Swiss-Prot record:
Compositionally biased residues, Basic residues: 1-10, 770-822
An annotated GO BP: endonucleolytic cleavage in ITS1 to separate SSU-rRNA from 5.8S rRNA and LSU-rRNA from tricistronic rRNA transcript (SSU-rRNA, 5.8S rRNA, LSU-rRNA)
Record region (Disordered): 1-54, 749-834
Stated name of the protein: Nucleolar protein 9
Provenance organism: Podospora anserina (strain S / ATCC MYA-4624 / DSM 980 / FGSC 10383) (Pleurage anserina)
Length: 834
């Protein structure tokens, strides 16, 4: 399995050959396009028409997010794979390759039209309009000029961006007009290098309209002054749901071909996500929908409501669910196990297959529900269709027990493949519990430690760890403990992080202690060395700083990825109470001041550790006090950096007093930080970051009204402590003011006794008013105190009286009972005598 892989030299040679074949194919396409132009009678050369599959694009749908992903994102381009996949397309599925349908050429724009639309695109990009009214009128004119030229604009290299911006700014009526213009030509558009982006944008922006129409919340469109109302076509009168279904009808015959088409596969993925009602702008979804080098076209003034709906899970009609099921069945109907295996290793087909499998498994009914008799009869009459999961792993979970079964061979062939392993990750994450148990019991469970060592197989193995029970997880930890040091040396830090996270989630405390012990052993048996080991904070050379990030060598990128994963482990351990957090806090306090400065300012990942440490409960006495004190010498340098700035701002928001479980920074330490900031006030005011820190710490209040700053800074304390301190502080302040006033009056009387008696100046009106108010307030307070005292005394008297009455009643009752008992005793005695 892993030993039969090609060497690095062979892979590079294959890649060069594939690129050469790609260039040759591109040149042939250019020649064919030129011949086509000559036959159409159009002899002038124009850069607007670019042949399909031209240029050197990237591999869509993949993101290098880990250390081992460099090998996983290897480019498997070549005619052999394409031919093998397209050879299984069938007659009606468009599987015969690009020639299975006739590509349309929509013509080219005239030079004047090109110039006009390019200028319009520049204006919209710059948003350089004096007012909104002028922008609205300008847009109306652009729409008017583009009427009837939508297909030419979409397939033009220089004007397709304008079409995308127009779609972003379109209202519901205009979007339906776009669907009407593209109708009947969608298959040619989605397989075109530039027009495919316009189709994707149209699908994405029209998705919220379906939800709005279902809820009856379609906003009314304000007509533009001077614009003539046009007659609506049949397509424009339809609902957005029907327009999407009509588009699917055009795709139906070519689904197998679109699975692996360089541009069409992206449009198919977008359409599937729209039909499923899933969020369309999440990080994971973006990597699935577009390649790394794809330009993201935006424009100011696009509808904010639509973007909110795109970011949420949307309500979709039942017809969309049925359409997804039909797409899954039709696209894979003519693909057998061998073809699916080839498609799973194809760089363009794999992401589409991932999405189809994900949708199928998420839409599958969960739990056993009793069906009615009529439904059971209908199901028996209908032929049972084989699902995509059954095609990939036939006979699962029972077939996993046999090493020679197709299901077992499929998993073993995918687990070490840089592209196929991604499909295996999707299968492991979403497959039913029975299938997962069989997969773990027969394939991953016995060899989990060897899978976790490998840079490619570790990713499916991590997905397995995420689904394990507490007992199975403990077994996996026991198998991996002897090789824990090797995992750290090989850079499998994501495996280490997953182990700690899952043990914490499953409450496996014994395994957590074992993992921490193994980590400590790998770091010279000392907690102080853990953070430096996981996050090597080496100083950069001046030459390295001068180089641009785009041209970083592979080794530098690898170090950055390792640092990122190391920071994630430290953050994870800080969030686990007990010994893990205690070990990290011990290691952080052992760092010198310059290392803490570098950690706080290097990048977002290292700064995240400092932020996490300041927000987690202390496991060591006075941890936050000592940690902030270590930052104090370099607090200005931290304040003036992008990543350190939020850390300095967060210190003032921390409590000055509190319980043991609350992060506390003593007030005197905050005063020391503020004093440091005041010394470099002029330097802080020179930059935006410095001004932000000065505002957050209320530096002007510190300079002008220190008492108010102290009161404000202590507002971060817990409410009970703050109220108690405020009450005590107010009394102390009143006493101090009274003592000062008496002392001043006594000194004045001693110095000028006659003047004080004879020539005492009259008080001004405001002073008199204040004095009267104060006297009234004091009288009122005295009166209230007196009333409270009287009420209290009355209440006490009443309670005493009630107690006395109760006591008397009790005594009377007891006497009465004694009297009643005496005659009874005498009667009993007489009866006994008789």
């Amino acid at each position: 399995m892993g030993k039969n892989r090609k060497s690095k030299r062979q892979l590079i040679r294959d890649e060069k050959r594939a690129k050469k074949r790609g260039h040759e194919n591109a040149e042939e396409e250019v020649r064919d396009a030129k011949r086509q132009r000559r036959t159409d009678g159009d002899e002038e050369h124009n850069a607007d028409f670019i042949p399909l599959d031209g240029g050197n694009g990237d591999i869509p749908g993949f993101v290098i997010d880990t250390v081992g992903d460099k090998r996983r994102a290897h480019k498997y381009e070549g005619g052999e794979v394409e031919a093998e996949i397209n050879g299984h397309g069938g007659d009606g599925g468009g599987g015969g390759g690009p020639g299975s349908f006739e590509r349309e050429f929509f013509g080219m724009l005239a030079e004047e039209e090109q110039e006009y639309f390019r200028h319009a695109d520049e204006l919209l990009e710059l948003n350089d309009f004096p007012s909104e009214e002028e922008k609205t009128i300008f847009l109306a004119n652009v729409y008017k000029e583009a009427k009837g030229k939508e297909l030419k604009l979409a397939s033009s290299q220089s004007c397709s961006r304008l079409m995308e911006r127009l779609i972003l700014l379109s209202n519901t009526k205009q979007k339906k007009s776009m669907f009407d213009a593209f109708s009947g030509h969608f298959i040619s558009l989605v397989t075109h290098r530039f027009a495919s982006h316009c189709c994707e944008k149209l699908f994405l922006q029209s998705a919220p309209v379906v939800t709005q129409e279902l809820a009856g919340e379609v906003p009314e469109e304000v007509p533009v002054e001077g614009q003539e109302e046009e007659e609506l076509t049949e397509n424009q009168k339809m609902s957005m749901e029907d327009l999407f279904l009509l588009t699917l009808d055009e795709f139906e015959e070519h689904l197998s071909f679109l699975l692996s088409d360089r541009y069409g596969s992206h449009a198919l993925r977008v359409l599937l996500l729209v039909l499923a009602g899933r969020p369309l702008n999440q990080a994971g979804v973006k990597s699935l929908l577009q390649g790394k080098s794809k330009e993201y076209v935006t424009v100011e003034g696009a509808a904010a409501n639509a973007s909110e709906l795109i970011s949420q899970t949307r309500t979709v009609p039942s017809s969309f669910t049925a359409a997804i099921q039909k797409i899954i069945v039709d696209s894979t109907a003519n693909l057998d196990g061998a073809a699916l295996r080839v498609l799973a290793k194809h760089p363009t087909g794999n992401p589409t297959l991932q999405l189809l499998l994900d949708l199928e498994l998420s839409m599958a009914p969960k739990g056993k529900k009793k069906a009615k008799k009529g439904e059971e009869e209908e199901r028996q009459e209908e032929p049972v269709k084989e699902t995509l999961l059954e095609k990939l792993v036939p006979g699962a979970p029972a077939s996993f027990a046999e090493e020679t079964s197709p299901a077992c061979e499929f998993v073993n062939s995918m687990v070490y493949d840089p592209i196929g392993s991604r499909l295996l990750e999707t299968l492991i994450t979403h497959c039913p519990g029975k299938v997962f148990k069989g997969l773990h019991a027969h394939i991953f469970g016995p060899r989990i430690q060897s899978f976790l060592r490998n840079d490619i197989a570790s990713y499916p193995a991590i997905k397995v760890l995420n689904r394990l029970s507490k007992e199975d997880l403990a077994d996996a930890v026991e198998k991996s403990l002897p090789e824990f040091g090797a995992l750290l040396e090989k850079g499998r830090l994501n495996v280490v992080r997953t182990y700690f996270e899952r043990c914490h989630v499953r409450n496996a405390t014994a395994q957590l202690d074992q993992l921490l012990q193994a980590l400590t052993k790998a770091c010279n048996n000392n907690w102080k060395h853990i953070v430096p080991k996981l996050c090597p904070l080496e100083e950069e050379n001046e030459e390295d700083k001068s180089k641009e990030k785009k041209f970083q060598p592979a080794e530098v990128k690898n170090k950055t990825a390792l640092l990122s994963h190391g920071c994630q482990i430290v953050s994870t351990l800080l969030s686990i109470p007990g010994n893990p957090a205690k070990a990290m806090q011990t290691s952080l306090l052992a760092l010198p001041a310059d290392k803490i400065l570098r950690m706080a300012t290097l990048n977002a990942h290292t700064a995240g550790i400092v932020t996490k440490a300041l927000s987690t409960p202390p496991q060591l006495p006075h941890f936050h006090k000592l940690f902030v004190a270590a930052m104090l010498p370099n607090i200005i340098d931290m304040a003036l950096t992008h990543h350190g700035n939020p850390i300095v701002c967060s210190i003032i928001t921390m409590a000055s007093k509190g319980d043991k479980d609350v992060p506390v920074v003593p007030f005197h330490l905050k005063e020391n930080v503020m004093a440091k900031l005041e010394q470099r006030e002029s330097q802080l005011r020179e930059s935006w970051l410095g001004r932000n820190v000065w505002r957050s710490w209320k530096g002007d209040l510190w300079s002008n009204r220190r008492h108010d700053w102290v009161r404000w800074a202590k507002e971060t304390n817990p409410e009970e402590l703050r109220l108690a301190a405020a009450a005590g502080g107010a009394k102390t302040l009143e006493k101090q003011e009274e003592a000062l006033k008496k002392r001043t009056e006594a000194l004045q009387e001693e110095a000028f006794p006659e003047e004080m008696e004879e020539d005492q100046p009259e008080e001004s009106e405001p002073v008199k008013v204040k004095k009267e108010k104060k006297e009234k307030k004091e009288k009122k307070e005295k009166k209230e105190k007196k009333e409270k005292k009287e009420k209290k005394e009355k209440k006490e008297k009443k309670e005493k009286k009630e107690k006395k009455e109760k006591k008397e009643k009790k005594e009377k009752k007891e006497k009465k009972e004694k009297k009643e008992k005496k005659p009874k005793v005498e009667e009993d005695a007489m009866e006994i005598d008789g």
